[in-house]
Regions:
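C-terminal motif of bacterial Sec signal peptides marking the signal peptidase cleavage site
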Residues: 25-28
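Bacterial signal peptide processing site
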Residues: 30-33
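Accessory cap/linker subdomain of secreted extracellular hydrolases
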Residues: 43-68, 202-355
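Gly/Ser-rich "nucleophile elbow"/oxyanion-hole loop immediately N-terminal to the catalytic nucleophile
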Residues: 94-95, 156-176, 192
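Short beta-strand element of the alpha/beta-hydrolase
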Residues: 97-107
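Primarily recognizes the serine-hydrolase "nucleophile elbow" in alpha/beta-hydrolase
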Residues: 169-224
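Short beta-strand/loop motif that positions the catalytic acidic residue
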Residues: 366-368
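Histidine-bearing beta->alpha loop at or near hydrolase active sites
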Residues: 396-409
């Protein structure tokens, strides 16, 4: 029997206001989008959906005290699914009937814990404050495993339907790396979702990560300490050699030895400043993000290569630019043996696990900070290209924000996106970047907030991913 036999009557005042504003704004939008989410529910059953029908029945979640984040009166439920993934469900006191299934960022290389779920609901409590139910898996497998994470995402949706209530509408939300998970879940289980929201998301497939091999090669050329000359040498595209015990702290120590990123620029030596600037210029990232990208290109890349039996990313034939003498730079990389070929079989396995083809037959709304140095905004163009190629281009609305943030773009940004997506699904009227920006300002005015917090850029024209990460 569902834990909520019926949903409470009424909706939050702000939710009613924002819905009304959305309807008004949508009435003037150009061109209808997908008329409803019903066609997705009627789509032919996929192989993954057929396989999911044989999954074991899931135990009911347990009612628990809510972690920090959800508003007063919200109900929180926890459990561990049949595959071993912890999850958290939150239902507001006055539920709209909409469910957002959240796919979190990362990935994290350790075992899944409730702490990860607590961190995400604290950040994404805006979903519940807007009146919507929230369900999120922590994913059974630590590390870069996308298909299994997509399965866990579908599984927590099924748990909600079986043990909490049947939603009026079900939406899929992918944040950061969770965008890759959500894209995979959307194609594996298309009949489960009526709309998709991507925020700061990885939506360009494996090419998103190519530059993490680039930064390893350029860093090693300049610093020569990862690995050191007296340590076993290995192809840097592996991340780390088998059996390595290197820690994050040890890597940071080496990076600071060469670049002194732990010091203000004024306290670095001229050589350290020059090396840091050169890496930033070639890789096209800010200096303060170099260490995080090297972490990924070391520890996460090692996880990826271990899972797929070889290096799925290489840099053979890549011509690097941004240095004072690009010809000399590329020749030096060639002579130093800092070119690495991707293993075709490992590449194929990696692509099969993580990639998407834009086959989303439901409304899709995205947002991204244009100065995001973790997941580059240019990946948004790849999403557009793929959805157009799949015949779904009319089902996409992309927004961009004046921000360098990645994990959370601000309290003002997400309510208008949620309402635009929900109203699109409900009415079939497609929003635009302009109407979403207008709605943001209206919601801010109604709630006593500052219109300046609505940093949407309706006229922003995103460039191709190849303009930021060299193609290979």
């Amino acid at each position: 029997m569902p834990l909520l036999s019926r949903r409470p009557a009424g909706t939050p005042r702000l939710l009613l206001l924002s819905a009304a504003l959305t309807l008004a704004l949508a009435a003037g939008c150009a061109g209808p989008g997908p008329q409803s989410a019903a066609p997705a529910a009627q789509a032919p059953e996929t192989a993954a959906e057929k396989a999911a029908a044989a999954w074991p029945a899931e135990a009911a979640p347990a009612a628990v005290t809510c972690p920090e984040g959800p508003p007063p009166g919200a109900r929180c439920l926890r459990g561990k699914d049949s595959a071993g993934a912890p999850y958290l469900i939150v239902v507001p006191a006055r539920w709209s009937g909409n469910l957002l299934v959240h796919a979190h960022g990362g990935p994290f290389l350790g075992a899944p814990t409730d702490a990860r779920a607590n961190e995400d609901i604290k950040r994404w409590s805006v979903i519940v404050r807007e009146g919507h139910a929230y369900a999120a898996s922590v994913f059974r497998q630590g590390g870069f495993a996308v298909t299994t994470a997509a399965e866990d995402t579908e599984r927590v949706r099924r748990i909600f339907v079986a043990h909490v209530d049947k939603p009026r509408r079900t939406f899929l939300h992918g944040q950061s790396w969770g965008g890759m998970v959500a894209a995979r879940a959307a194609e594996l289980y298309p009949r489960s979702w009526e709309g998709i929201l991507f925020t700061s998301a990885v939506v360009a497939g494996p090419a998103t990560y190519d530059f993490r091999v680039d930064i390893r090669a350029v860093y090693q050329h300049l610093c020569k300490n990862h690995p050191r000359a007296d340590e076993p040498q290995y192809p840097l595209a592996l991340g780390l050699p088998a059996g390595s015990t290197m820690t994050n702290a040890q890597l940071a120590a080496r990076v600071n030895e060469c670049l002194a990123l732990n010091k203000p620029a004024a306290e670095r030596t001229p050589e350290q400043r020059a090396r840091a600037k050169l890496i930033a210029d070639i890789i096209r990232v800010p200096e303060n993000s170099i260490l995080s990208h090297l972490n990924w290109g070391t520890f996460t890349l090692a996880d990826v290569t271990r899972r797929h039996g070889g290096a799925p990313i290489g840099n053979t034939g890549v011509r690097y630019t941004g240095s004072p003498n690009d010809a000399a730079l590329n020749a030096d990389l060639d002579r130093a043996g800092l070119r690495f070929a991707a293993d075709p079989a490992a590449r194929a396995r990696f692509v099969a696990d993580v990639d998407h083809q834009g086959r989303f037959a439901v409304p899709v709304v995205t947002t991204h900070g244009i100065h995001d140095s973790t997941v580059f905004v240019e990946g948004s163009d790849t999403l557009r290209q793929r959805m157009v190629a799949a015949g779904n281009g009319q089902g996409l609305v992309q927004t961009f924000v004046e921000s360098s943030e990645h994990s959370y773009l601000g309290e003002a940004i997400y309510p208008p996106l949620l309402q635009a997506l929900i109203t699109w699904v409900d009415t079939g009227r497609k929003p635009t970047p302009v109407t979403i920006a207008e709605q943001c300002r209206s919601l801010q005015a109604a709630g006593g907030g500052a219109a300046a917090d609505c940093r949407f850029l309706p006229d922003y024209a995103v460039k191709t991913l190849a303009s930021r990460i060299p193609a290979r």
